[in-house]
């Protein structure tokens, strides 16, 4: 590796709105503020909401459901 051309790594803190603090190495050199992290993201915590698309599915089946039946 050539000396003097690589960026320096510094340990920074990434702080989430839930209060979770993550320490990472970065070349940016400043702390980060995160909106969501793995500790509070709805997918990982199991609190995700199911979007009601029943009307769309019924409309699709009414329109194209006959084509799939044999």
Curated annotation (Swiss-Prot):
Keywords: Metal-binding, Ribonucleoprotein, Ribosomal protein, RNA-binding, rRNA-binding, Zinc
Positions annotated to bind Zn(2+): 16, 18, 37, 40
Keyword Zinc: yes
CC per GO annotation: ribonucleoprotein complex; ribosome
Keyword Translocase included in the entry's annotation: no
One of the protein's GO biological processes: translation
Cofactor(s) required for function per UniProt: Zn(2+)
Sample GO molecular function, one term: rRNA binding
Family matches, as InterPro entries: Ribosomal_bL28/bL31-like_sf, Ribosomal_bL31, Ribosomal_bL31_A, Ribosomal_bL31_sf
Alphabetized Pfam families for the sequence: Ribosomal_L31
Cofactor descriptive note: Binds 1 zinc ion per subunit.
Signal peptide: none
General function of this protein: Binds the 23S rRNA.
Family that this chain belongs to: Belongs to the bacterial ribosomal protein bL31 family. Type A subfamily.
Quaternary organization: Part of the 50S ribosomal subunit.
PANTHER family assigned: 50S RIBOSOMAL PROTEIN L31, CHLOROPLASTIC, LARGE RIBOSOMAL SUBUNIT PROTEIN BL31A
Protein name: Large ribosomal subunit protein bL31
Organism, as annotated: Shewanella denitrificans (strain OS217 / ATCC BAA-1090 / DSM 15013)
Organismal lineage: Bacteria, Pseudomonadati, Pseudomonadota, Gammaproteobacteria, Alteromonadales
Gene name in the database record: rpmE
């Amino acid at each position: 590796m050539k000396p003097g051309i690589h960026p320096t790594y510094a340990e920074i803190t990434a702080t989430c709105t839930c209060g979770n603090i993550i320490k990472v190495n970065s070349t940016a050199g400043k702390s980060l503020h995160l909106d969501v992290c793995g500790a509070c993201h709805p997918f990982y915590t199991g609190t995700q909401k199911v979007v009601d698309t029943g009307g769309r599915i019924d409309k699709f089946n009414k329109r194209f459901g006959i084509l799939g039946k044999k």
